[in-house]
Curated annotation (Swiss-Prot):
Pfam families named among the record's database cross-references: CxxCxxCC (PF03692)
Gene that encodes the chain: ycgN
InterPro entries, A to Z: Puta_zinc/iron-chelating_dom (IPR005358), UCP006173 (IPR008228)
Family: Belongs to the UPF0260 family.
Taxonomic lineage from the root: Bacteria, Pseudomonadati, Pseudomonadota, Gammaproteobacteria, Enterobacterales
Protein name per its UniProtKB record: UPF0260 protein YcgN
S-S pairs: none
Amino acid sequence: MSDTPFWQRKTLDEMTDAEWESLCDGCGQCCLHKLMDEDTDEIYFTNVACRQLNIKTCQCRHYERRFEFEPDCIKLTRENLPDFEWLPMTCAYRLLAEGKPLPTWHPLLTGSKAAMHGERISVRHIAVKESEVRDWQDHILNKPSWAE
């Protein structure tokens, strides 16, 4: 068996489902609601978290059954990855698709999510509960640094 990590020796298409899932750093950025301008198709990021997101841990409360609770939840696959142009520049799926390395704080490299939270990559420092928001437009973020 090779000492080279799977993400360095396999393409995204060659990865097992477990390997694919492990690429997610758990930052929660996918779980923040986005608004799209109907005229321009421009996407606006908000700090409004999906009802299923545990903001403290940045984990879905019902990940395996998330579509039962949130039918519009994102399902990122090998096939639809190109459709998600808004994925943050820090996203492992995006980085590997672009032939770039994982960031040094990535949980696959560090063994925990502490470095990711420490770098403020996760949304736990900006997210607000959907149930506490009246007007999502009041929660539009300037383009977040992780989206650039």
